[in-house]
Amino acid sequence: MSDAQRTGLLIVDLQNDFLAPEGAYARGGAVSPAALALPARVAPVAQAVKAAGGLVVACQFTLWPDAQGEPMIAPHLKALRPFLRRGDFQQGAWGHQHVDAILPWVDVSVSKVAYSAFFNTQLDWVLRHAGVETLAICGIVTNGGVASSLRDAHMREYHTVVLSDGCAAFKTTTHEASLADMGTISEVMTCEAFTRQLSAQH
C-alpha cells in the first residue's frame, strides 16, 4: 500500500441538523457562520482521498430516542441547547444525514453520542482493518468533536493531521487557540496543502 492508501479522512458532524437552514441548529439560532463554508471546502479533500485510494469516514452526532420517543440528551447539552426536540439528530432522519456536498465521497458513516468519534463506536476497528495509519480530521467544532477525536486518535497511535481551514468553531479565537493546542501533538495543515501532499504520495 502507498502512503496515500494508508490515509484516512475523518469528517466530524457535517450534518443537516447542524448546518442546513431547515436544521435543528438553524431553528435554534445556533449555527456557526464559519461552519457554513466547510462542506464546499472539505468535499474536494474527500474526493482527493478517495482518488488516492484512501478511506473517507464521516461521523454523525446522534440523539437516540427513549421508550417514549423523546431524545436522550446529556444534561450539559440540554442546558446548552434547550431548543433540541423529538426527531432532532435521530438516526434515519433527514437532519441526521450528512450534508449533500460530502455524501458522494463517504465510505463509512459512524454514529456517535459524544464529542469524540472514537467513544463507544467501531471507528478504530474500521480504520485498522482498512489499513489506515494517517488520519486527517476536519469538521465541527474545532474545540469539541474535532479536538476530542484527534486526541483519541493520538492515544491510539495514529499519525494525525488537523485541517486548519477544514474545521470551525463558534468564535475565531476559540478556533485558533484549539488549533494551537492540537499542534502540540499533531500536524496542522490547510486543506490545500494536505491535498497537495496526498497527490505527491499517490
Residue ranges and their predicted role:
Residues 5-7, 23-49, 54-55, 61:
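A short alpha/beta connector and helix-capping loop motif
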Residues 8-14:
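N-terminal nucleotide-binding beta1-loop-alpha1 segment
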Residues 11, 58, 162:
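Short beta-strand "acidic-cap" motif of Rossmann-like dinucleotide-binding folds
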Residues 15-20:
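Short acidic, Gly/Ser-rich segments with clustered Asp/Glu that frequently serve as metal-coordination loops
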Residues 21-22, 69:
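Short, solvent-exposed loop/turn and secondary-structure capping segments
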Residues 57-58, 136:
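A structural signal for short, well-ordered beta-strand segments and their strand-loop junctions
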Residues 59-62, 140:
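Short, well-ordered beta-to-alpha junction loops that form the rim of enzyme active sites
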